[in-house]
């Protein structure tokens, strides 16, 4: 079981959470949330919500009914096994998500292409701190966009390159034509069920983002309804910006986000009671000097910690935290900001994190080097969360060791003790060598150089999953021509 440090308790009290909940209820009942979808509006009407045009107002009773059916934990099942998500389990992770451009090893910014996305899939597949895979870039310029549906070919790439479960994105009206997005979402779910030959359980998890302030677009709603009808879990998130799409006060951002997320969760439970859903937010600050989304701001951590406390109050699985930075390069700023925001995931203890590695410039850039550097940050935070192993038995043992060494003695004798190996994290990329700095630097090089070398070694050592003929035949119906088996 993962130790839950509940770091959010240092930010918000139980009374604070109750106040946030109280005003969220008022927003739901008195202000409402916009749903740009007739089918969703009819579902709310049928279950007694107040519907005024596209605005849905939800009372406390309807909210509580939905929260009663939403599960505390759930499991994603694939042919490789089970991935459990919930408060008692280690946070689950997935990498760089959807930036249009990458920072490449030659220090140039370029539009990502399909092979660049595949390289990220290989890094995610070979990562010991990455649980899911996803498309790190979408709708790349080298895809065949004459097809009515060039989204499913991208989805199929995740199944080709990894046996880890997939964290999906919503289809949109740009990459799917000729059918509804709801049908596309159902088709994606059916592809995964057929590929795994698992028909009665969740087989993938999908990210769905509200439209702040207090709204859901028809595209997102179509995807939510299609996936939930197929029994597949969704993450409902907000990504609001203070003083732009959320109030200037952090308190207002948390209240508005909470009301928005809860409204989406209610819809999932009205469609399919008991369907797994994750309560999530990556809402953040706005730098009003240039009206920019600032995902590495300390206010982002504060907003997400408070939202994490609310998710725990509702006893729902929670998604918060990112290796988020506004930096343009994997530099000092990137490390500081990524560590700070990822604290929400590992020490606040949320249950899922998207963009746990590899993102730059407020989601606009991906970086292979930052991915492997962020892996080290994830490992450090995992180690910090374990804490110190303190027990009567261990105390007696270390006292004997202290007594044996005595004053001015030492502990360096024989083989490295088991306790050292168990309790110390040893970095793969960061420098810990001591001595004359110049020869050390000449030997190991700059940190980015070491990261780049790690990337190339990982990609070179990658091997495709061993798929069955049936699985290959299924994927060949969808994969881009140059990716078929």
UniProtKB/Swiss-Prot annotation:
One annotated GO molecular function: methyltransferase activity
Keyword Magnesium annotated: no
Induction comment: Up-regulated during growth on proline betaine.
GO biological process: methanogenesis; methylation
EC number: 2.1.1.-
A Pfam cross-reference name: MTTB
InterPro entries in UniProt: MttB-like_sf, MTTB_MeTrfase
Catalytic activity: Co(I)-[quaternary-amine-specific corrinoid protein] + L-proline betaine + H(+) = methyl-Co(III)-[quaternary-amine-specific corrinoid protein] + N-methyl-L-proline
Keyword annotations of the record: Methyltransferase, Transferase
Class of the enzyme per the UniProt entry, highest EC level: transferase
Source organism, top-level taxon: Bacteria
Family from the record: Belongs to the trimethylamine methyltransferase family.
Complex and partners: The proline betaine:THF methyl transfer system is composed of two methyltransferases, MtpB and MtqA, and the corrinoid protein MtqC.
Task of the protein: Involved in the degradation of the quaternary amine L-proline betaine. Component of a corrinoid-dependent methyltransferase system that transfers a methyl group from L-proline betaine to tetrahydrofolate (THF), forming methyl-THF, a key intermediate in the Wood-Ljungdahl acetogenesis pathway. MtpB catalyzes the methylation of the corrinoid protein MtqC, using L-proline betaine as the methyl donor. Shows weak activity with some other quaternary amines, including carnitine, phosphocholine, glycine betaine or betonicine, but cannot methylate free cob(I)alamin.
Official protein name in the record: Proline betaine:corrinoid methyltransferase
């Amino acid at each position: 079981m993962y130790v839950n440090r509940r770091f959010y308790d240092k930010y918000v009290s139980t009374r604070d959470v109750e106040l946030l909940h109280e005003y969220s209820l008022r927003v739901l009942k008195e202000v409402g949330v916009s749903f740009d979808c007739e089918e969703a509006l009819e579902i709310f009407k049928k279950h007694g919500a107040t519907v005024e045009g596209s605005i849905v107002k939800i009372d406390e009773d309807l909210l509580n009914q939905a929260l009663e059916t939403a599960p505390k934990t759930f499991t994603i099942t694939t042919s490789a096994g089970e991935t459990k998500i919930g408060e008692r389990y280690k946070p689950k992770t997935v990498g760089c998500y959807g930036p249009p451009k990458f920072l490449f090893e030659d220090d140039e910014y370029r539009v990502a292409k399909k092979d660049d996305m595949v390289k990220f899939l290989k890094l995610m597949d070979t990562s010991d701190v990455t649980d899911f895979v996803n498309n790190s870039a979408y709708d790349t310029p080298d895809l065949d966009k004459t097809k009515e549906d060039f989204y499913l070919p991208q989805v199929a790439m995740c199944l080709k390159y990894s046996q880890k479960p997939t964290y999906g994105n919503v289809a949109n009206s740009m990459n799917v034509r000729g059918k509804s997005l709801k049908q596309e979402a159902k088709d994606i779910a059916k592809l995964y069920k057929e590929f795994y030959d698992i028909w009665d359980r969740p087989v993938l998890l999908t990210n769905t983002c509200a439209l702040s302030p207090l709204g859901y677009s028809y595209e997102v709603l179509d995807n939510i309804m299609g996936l939930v009808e197929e029994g597949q879990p969704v993450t409902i998130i907000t990504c609001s910006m203070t003083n732009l799409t959320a109030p200037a006060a952090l308190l207002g951002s948390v209240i508005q986000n909470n009301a928005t997320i809860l409204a989406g969760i209610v819809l999932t439970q009205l469609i399919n009671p008991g369907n797994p859903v994750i309560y999530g937010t990556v809402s953040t600050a706005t730098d009003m000097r240039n009206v920019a989304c600032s995902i590495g701001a300390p206010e982002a951590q504060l907003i997400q910690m408070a939202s994490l406390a609310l998710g725990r109050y509702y006893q729902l699985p929670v998604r918060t935290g990112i290796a988020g930075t506004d930096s343009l390069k994997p530099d000092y700023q990137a490390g500081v900001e990524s560590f700070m925001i990822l604290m929400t995931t590992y020490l606040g203890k949320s249950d899922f994190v998207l963009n746990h590695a590899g993102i730059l410039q407020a989601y606009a850039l991906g970086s292979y080097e930052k991915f492997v550097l962020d892996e080290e940050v994830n490992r450090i935070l995992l180690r910090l969360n374990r804490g110190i192993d303190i027990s009567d038995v261990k105390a007696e043992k270390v006292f004997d060791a202290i007594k044996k060494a005595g004053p001015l003695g030492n502990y360096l004798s024989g083989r490295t003790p088991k306790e050292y190996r168990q309790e110390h994290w040893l970095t793969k990329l960061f420098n810990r060598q001591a001595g004359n700095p110049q020869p050390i630097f000449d030997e190991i090089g700059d940190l980015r150089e070491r990261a780049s070398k790690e990337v190339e070694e990982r990609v070179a050592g990658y091997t495709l999953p061993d798929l069955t003929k049936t699985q290959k035949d299924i994927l060949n119906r969808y994969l881009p021509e140059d990716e078929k088996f």
